[in-house]
Amino acid sequence: MTQQTVSAELAFSQPLGEQEQQILTPDAVEFLSDLVTRFTPQRNRLLAARVAEQAAIDAGELPDFISETASIRESDWTIRGIPDDLLDRRVEITGPVERKMVINALNANVKVFMADFEDSLAPSWSKVIDGQINLRDAINGTISWTNEAGKIYQLKPDPAVLICRVRGLHLPEKHVTWRDEPIPGSLFDFALYFFHNVDALLAKGSGPYFYLPKTQSWQEAAWWSEVFSFAEDRFSLPRGTIKATLLIETLPAVFQMDEILHALRDHIVGLNCGRWDYIFSYIKTLKNHPDRVLPDRQSVTMEKPFLNAYSRLLIKTCHRRGAFAMGGMAAFIPSKDSERNDWVLNKVKADKQMEADNGHDGTWIAHPGLADAVMDIFDKALAGRSNQLSVLREEDASVTAAQLLESCPGERTEDGMRANIRVAVQYIEAWISGNGCVPIYGLMEDAATAEISRTSIWQWIHHEKSLSNGQTVTRALFRQMLAEEMLVIQEELGDRRFSQGRFDEAARLMEQITTSETLIDFLTLPGYRLLA
């Protein structure tokens, strides 16, 4: 690879072709360079703080509310405010920043499209550059796509509001280096989206809106507040022009929701229940605690007390501060089989009804075919209102740390373990092949599901847990099942698809991250090394 330097501070390893030159303009690169040099050292300190915090929990401590910040939790204050075009978010659709998906999502019967550079995108260089071009074209109203049959996809006149989800603090952008280290992917995504689109967004009465993933502390939220304020000052924009919704999808963050809202109060408009990553984080954070091992992932549903407490506390905290409380993802995919489709819709409706009844202001779907059914539930719940900010849940008893940490009963089954293996291997294979959003067994899977699958098995091995049939989960048992399930995958997909894919590499990575002595933080980190 040729090293191409287009900035005094940053080095780019990829040749700057026609696509790159549209996005990596000299002024855009200068802005990115300023952000990287100013904010990367503190980002590195924040990642080091995560390691120290986890070491304390591994040694026996449990996450808890922070005594030093009690005054923030107990005093009365609210966030700065919510822009008009974000006051109604009853249904949001999520998906990667691929051209056809961007058009279909913006045209769906939803209020918001969360365009994703994170868990549903495998961030190869071409995908992140194309993603920036696609969002720029969508905002300018010029995006179109033609399929092989000649069908043209274009935006309808009144598309959904666009929110951009950037990569988490831990993810690097390896194709750009600063001082011989990959720059933060989060700053790469933020800088280029903001730089190219802020003027057009403001001109049409919207703004630069972001979703922030994987936050673990209020200090990380404060870092984002500084990044946003720097960008606003650099472009002579009023404070609070940039707005963010932050995902509460890690166990440490659930104890710091007031503090996170307070640290980002100029810019934040809401929090979101990132339920699948939250379950993954629960397993990962409490991995050394044998009394907090979860059962099969299929039985860990939002009705379980520890997850219901998380949802209720998020709603109560957000609405007290004037912020939105967004519900979690419905990962189901509609089916062409009418009986299966009825089952899917009933599952989704029950889940979304519970969220609406709890007081959520809106919710997430992964497929436009669910939009009408979910919209209908929230239309009825809102009854003419735009949101449920008035639902304060003041009558609720306080949610305690013990409730948030309480494991849930349930079986660990051989079928569940085998299903975990098949889903994780197929997802990893797709991800390292460049596809981060994958339909598997009727669910639209992203990285969170594979993370739950592999961390569950790691923890069962680590604590020598037994399956319901009496078998102890060991590395040897896992390796045996992995070999057997690879044959099942081959049979399900067919020899041609299997041989053309990267299933052997995916199985090796699954084996490595599931049997390692120490639990690897995110499968996307070793996975990224296998991505172009």
Regions flagged by a language model, labelled:
Residues 2-532:
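Expand to "…catalyze enediolate/carbanion chemistry for C-C bond making/breaking, isomerization
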